C-alpha cells in the first residue's frame, strides 16, 4: 500500500521499560498499551503514508457513496512489477472496552477480496471468528461465526448491499438488523476513530470549530489553554449563523478540502447550513487602561490557529476515549508549544 512494499507493524504494546512512568500506559487485563506514540524518521520515509493508511481504513469503513462501479481508493506499491498488480492488505488489532478484536482486509482499487473480523473471548482463549467475507463468483459471500445469529432473509439483504468495492460495515449500516459484538466494533468506528489531523491549518481550524460550537466545556478548556500558551488570548467564543443552501455554497462545499467526502454528501442533502465563526478575545493594557478586542481567525497567526485546532481535537478525543492521528504535529508551532501540547 502506497510506499509500503513489505509488511510494516506499528504497535502500541508497551515494553517492560518503566523509566517513563505508568501514567503513559493503560492496562486492559494483562495487556499494557501506550496512551500515545510518536513517529520519527527521515523525509520520504513513509511516516505520513502510515497515517494515511489509518485514514484510508476509517474512510473505507464509513463511506456511504453507493455506486456499482465505484473504486475503493486503495493504491498499491507501484515501484515493483509484482506488487502493482497485487491487493493491499491491512490488519488491525484493537480493544473495544475490554474486548480484543482482530480485523483484516485485502483489496485493490476495484474490489474487496477478503474481509474478516475475529475476537478473543478471554485472554487465554483462541480467537473466534465473527465475520468472514470473500469475493466469489463476482459477488460478496458473507459467513458469520456461531456467535452471530442472522436470519436467511437478513443475510441475503446484507449480501446484496455488500457491493464488491464496499466495506462490510457500509453494507451493514443499510440493513435493519442486530449483530452482537460486530455492532460494538461498528459503533467504535463511528464514535471513537477520529479524522486524521493534517498539516494544513485550514482543515484543522474547521474541524475545531465544529467541536467548539457544540460543546461549551471545550470552549472553556481552549480559552484556558490559549492563555497558558501566552498568545495574549483571554477568551474564545463562537457565533453560529444559519444560512440557506445556495448553489454557490454547494459548489464551495463540493470543492472544499475541509469537508470529508461523507460529510459533503450529508451537507448536500440539507436545506440549511450552520456556519461557525470563532472570535478570539484579546485583552490589552494601554494608555486608556485595560481594553478587550475580538479578532476573527483570519487575523490570527498560523501557529495560533494550528494550536487551537490540534488541542481541540485532542481534548475531544480524550473525552470520547478515542483514537486520533496527527500528521506533523509541529507544523507552524514553536517547539515549546509542542511541548505544552504533549504535557497536557
Predicted regions and their residues:
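Switch/communication elements of ASCE P-loop NTPase nucleotide-binding domains
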Residues: 1-29, 35-49, 53-62, 281, ...
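Short acidic/polar mixed-charge low-complexity motifs
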Residues: 6, 97-101, 111, 125-127, ...
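Conserved P-loop NTP-binding catalytic core
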Residues: 25-38, 42, 51-112
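Short beta-strand segments that buttress and anchor functional surface loops
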Residues: 90-95, 117, 280-282
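Electropositive, glycine-dotted interaction segments
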Residues: 102-254
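A short mid-domain helix/strand-loop element embedded in enzyme catalytic domains
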Residues: 185-201, 272-290
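Generic recognition of flexible, low-complexity loop/linker segments
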Residues: 221-226, 265-268, 312-314
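Mixed-charge, low-complexity intrinsically disordered segments
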Residues: 246-275
Amino acid at each position: 500500500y502506497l510506499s509500503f512494499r513489505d509488511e510494516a507493524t506499528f504497535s502500541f504494546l508497551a515494553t517492560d521499560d518503566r523509566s517513563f512512568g505508568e501514567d503513559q500506559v493503560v492496562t486492559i487485563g494483562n495487556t499494557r498499551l501506550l496512551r500515545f506514540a510518536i513517529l520519527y524518521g527521515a523525509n520520504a520515509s513513509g511516516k505520513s503514508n502510515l497515517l494515511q493508511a489509518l485514514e484510508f481504513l476509517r474512510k473505507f469503513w464509513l463511506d456511504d457513496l453507493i455506486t456499482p462501479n465505484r473504486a475503493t481508493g486503495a493504491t498499491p506499491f507501484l515501484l515493483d512489477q509484482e506488487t502493482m498488480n497485487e491487493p493491499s492488505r491491512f490488519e488491525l488489532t484493537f480493544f473495544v472496552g475490554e474486548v480484543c478484536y482482530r480485523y483484516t482486509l485485502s483489496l485493490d482499487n476495484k474490489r474487496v477480496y477478503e474481509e474478516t473480523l475475529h475476537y478473543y473471548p478471554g485472554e487465554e482463549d483462541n480467537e473466534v471468528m465473527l465475520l468472514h467475507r470473500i469475493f466469489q463468483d463476482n459477488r460478496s459471500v458473507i459467513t458469520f461465526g456461531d456467535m452471530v445469529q442472522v436470519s436467511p432473509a437478513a443475510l441475503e439483504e446484507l449480501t446484496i448491499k455488500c457491493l464488491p468495492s464496499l466495506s462490510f460495515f457500509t453494507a451493514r449500516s443499510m440493513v435493519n438488523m442486530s449483530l452482537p459484538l460486530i455492532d460494538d466494533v461498528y459503533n467504535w468506528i463511528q464514535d471513537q476513530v477520529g479524522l486524521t489531523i493534517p498539516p494544513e491549518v485550514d482543515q484543522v481550524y474547521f474541524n475545531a470549530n465544529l467541536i467548539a460550537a457544540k460543546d461549551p466545556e471545550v470552549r472553556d478548556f481552549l480559552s484556558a489553554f490559549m492563555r497558558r500558551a501566552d498568545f495574549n488570548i483571554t477568551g474564545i467564543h463562537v457565533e453560529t449563523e444559519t444560512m440557506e443552501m445556495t448553489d454557490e455554497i454547494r459548489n464551495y462545499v463540493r470543492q472544499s478540502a475541509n469537508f470529508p467526502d461523507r460529510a459533503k454528501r450529508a451537507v448536500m442533502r440539507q436545506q440549511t447550513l450552520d456556519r461557525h465563526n470563532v472570535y478570539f478575545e484579546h485583552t490589552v493594557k494601554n494608555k486608556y487602561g485595560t481594553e478587550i478586542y475580538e479578532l476573527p481567525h483570519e487575523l490570527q497567526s498560523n501557529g495560533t490557529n494550528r494550536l487551537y485546532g490540534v488541542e481541540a481535537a485532542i481534548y475531544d478525543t480524550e473525552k470520547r476515549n478515542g483514537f486520533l492521528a496527527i500528521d506533523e504535529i509541529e507544523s507552524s508551532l514553536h517547539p515549546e508549544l509542542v511541548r505544552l501540547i504533549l504535557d497536557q
